[in-house]
């Protein structure tokens, strides 16, 4: 279950598994964004209501285009995200019609990030697409900062764990509405 190489867990993710992996600030739980059963499993593990929505994290913007509707965004709005990516900034963007509500929750938008974390970059490049990302913790608990904390909260419940260093960020990503520019977190 414990892997040093994120690419070693690609098949696990593509087969519907939920994995934990280091991000810029905390350990994340992730799965295939195109697999509703995997997304539901992740939500159940975390005890998170589907209405809240989830984040997609990618290695580059092109990986996000199948999930968002960038046609309604201005050049300046897109550029505001590109100016901060890759990095610890999550942008709320309009979702593509037909996107699973398990990803977007009750919203007409989707939270997306292009990560600068080497492990996340490697994982998404190996997958060839983004991965669902939410902090590795039960709802109401503190996010896991080490593999040991992930195991303590999710032992026997996740399908893989990438061991590695967290990034240098002291807190989870800043969330910005790309249309209004408003900082939400």
Swiss-Prot record:
A GO BP annotation: regulation of translational fidelity
Pfam families: Sua5_yciO_yrdC (PF01300)
Subcellular location: Cytoplasm
YrdC-like domain boundaries: 3-185
GO cellular component: cytoplasm
Reactions it catalyzes: L-threonine + hydrogencarbonate + ATP = L-threonylcarbamoyladenylate + diphosphate + H2O
EC numbers: 2.7.7.87
Molecular function as annotated in GO: ATP binding; double-stranded RNA binding; L-threonylcarbamoyladenylate synthase; tRNA binding
Keyword annotations: ATP-binding, Cytoplasm, Nucleotide-binding, Nucleotidyltransferase, Transferase, tRNA processing
InterPro entries: DHBP_synth_RibB-like_a/b_dom, Sua5-like_dom, TC-AMP_synthase, TC-AMP_synthase_SUA5
Top-level taxon of origin: Bacteria
HAMAP family xref list: TsaC
Role, per record: Required for the formation of a threonylcarbamoyl group on adenosine at position 37 (t(6)A37) in tRNAs that read codons beginning with adenine. Catalyzes the conversion of L-threonine, HCO(3)(-)/CO(2) and ATP to give threonylcarbamoyl-AMP (TC-AMP) as the acyladenylate intermediate, with the release of diphosphate.
Name the UniProt record assigns to this protein: Threonylcarbamoyl-AMP synthase
Organism the protein comes from: Shewanella loihica (strain ATCC BAA-1088 / PV-4)
Source taxonomy: Bacteria, Pseudomonadati, Pseudomonadota, Gammaproteobacteria, Alteromonadales
